[in-house]
UniProtKB/Swiss-Prot annotation:
Record-linked CDD domains: YlxS_C
Subcellular location: Cytoplasm
Transmembrane segments: none
Function: Required for maturation of 30S ribosomal subunits.
SUPFAM superfamilies: YhbC-like, C-terminal domain (SSF74942), YhbC-like, N-terminal domain (SSF75420)
Keywords associated with the record: Cytoplasm, Ribosome biogenesis
PANTHER family xrefs: RIBOSOME MATURATION FACTOR RIMP
Family from the record: Belongs to the RimP family.
Annotated GO biological process: ribosomal small subunit assembly; translation
Name this polypeptide is given: Ribosome maturation factor RimP
Database matches in Gene3D superfamilies: Ribosome maturation factor RimP, C-terminal domain, RimP-like superfamily, N-terminal
Pfam families, sorted: DUF150_C, RimP_N
Gene name of the record: rimP
Length: 151
């Protein structure tokens, strides 16, 4: 996490805790000629536009007071979306029993992607039901995990 991302995280936590929101991620990056500070939040039942506005206004005021960013930037506060990557233990726990896609750094059985039902997460292992069989993956070998969205 960059210094600016850490500052934004520290500044936003009081309003998140007060409203029982979860901080999913903070990103500070340049896209084209613009810098973006993105804050992704969530809560049980989902985030609303009013929730995003509340957090955005609060964080904007705090950032103006501290002024940690020397150049212009765009502040965005949003929900992480349905297909957000699973990163934290809570993300995995929330998705037990659901379909996920696992991407690996190196292939296993000539495959780098596996899709199956998440049946267990131990912190250092992901266990899915893949083709009717239990399959384990060490987190150190996993590059990305995301939910499978079916409509």
């Amino acid at each position: 996490m960059s210094k600016i991302e850490q500052i934004a995280k520290d500044l936003v936590m009081p309003v998140l805790e007060k409203n029982n929101f979860e901080l999913v991620d903070v990103e500070y990056k340049k896209e084209g000629s613009h810098w973006y500070l993105r804050v992704y939040i969530d809560k049980e039942g989902g985030i609303t536009l009013d929730d995003c506005q509340l957090v955005s206004e609060y964080l904007s005021d705090r950032l103006d007071e501290v002024d940690p960013i020397e150049h212009s930037y765009i502040l965005e506060v949003s929900s992480p979306g349905l297909d957000r990557p699973l990163k934290k233990p809570r993300d995995f726990e929330r998705n037990i029993g659901k379909e996920i896609e696992i991407s690996l750094y190196a292939p296993i059985d000539k495959r780098k992607k596996f899709e199956g039902e998440l049946i267990e997460f131990t912190g250092d292992k992901i266990i899915i039901l893949y083709n009717g069989e239990r399959k384990e993956f060490d987190m150190k070998n996993v590059s990305l995990v995301k939910p499978v969205i079916k409509f």
